[in-house]
């Protein structure tokens, strides 16, 4: 006995199959509005959400993957700070289930930033519940990681609670 289209995910809480929709900037825009977040268009396929300690980029350019990538505001300007960032990236990637962390060299080749990223496979689209859950979990994981960074690497923090440089 069939309960419906078995190719769609079944939501046991609602007792029905839920539809999947392609992920695009319009859907991300609706999620961000729903959470009262300020954001701008970074490109046709990417929205940027500035916060006090990072800029979060919601990227829909790959039709198979939805990516949330956040650039932390802390910057390594010397060898000791670079080594500290390397250690924090290593620690994040070896002890946390997410986000994935990596270093990002600046164009001058002498300074480095840190990026944290969460991805979800979206080849068949995502339901509203899946998109909301990805928003909640990925934002929480990245924000928690950045909060820990600010505690561990307090000398990197050059901004105040409002996000202005001190």
Task: For the regions a language model picked out, list residue spans one by one.
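Generic recognition of long tandem-repeat/solenoid scaffolds
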Residues: 45-50, 68, 114-116
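A short, surface-exposed beta-strand/turn
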Residues: 62-64, 138-141
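Short, internal acidic amphipathic alpha-helical interface segments
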Residues: 72-117
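Short amphipathic alpha-helical signal-transduction/dimerization elements
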Residues: 90-93, 139-146, 150-153
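Short, highly charged C-terminal tails/helix-capping segments
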Residues: 150-166
């Amino acid at each position: 006995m069939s309960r419906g289209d078995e190719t769609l995910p079944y939501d046991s809480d609602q007792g029905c199959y839920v539809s999947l929709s392609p992920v695009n900037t319009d859907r991300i825009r609706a999620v961000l509005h729903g959470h009262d977040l300020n954001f701008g268009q970074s490109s046709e396929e990417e929205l940027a959400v500035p916060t006090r300690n990072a800029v979060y980029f919601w990227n829909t350019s790959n039709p198979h993957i939805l990516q949330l990538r956040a650039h932390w505001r802390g910057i390594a300007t010397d060898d000791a700070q670079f080594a500290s960032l390397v250690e924090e990236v290593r620690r994040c990637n070896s002890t946390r289930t997410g986000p994935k962390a990596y270093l990002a060299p600046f164009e001058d080749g002498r300074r480095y930033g840190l990026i944290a990223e969460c991805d979800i496979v979206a080849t068949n689209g995502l339901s509203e519940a899946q998109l909301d859950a990805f928003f909640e979990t990925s934002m929480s994981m990245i924000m928690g990681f950045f909060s820990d960074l600010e505690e561990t690497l307090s000398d990197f923090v050059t901004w105040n609670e409002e996000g202005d440089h001190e």
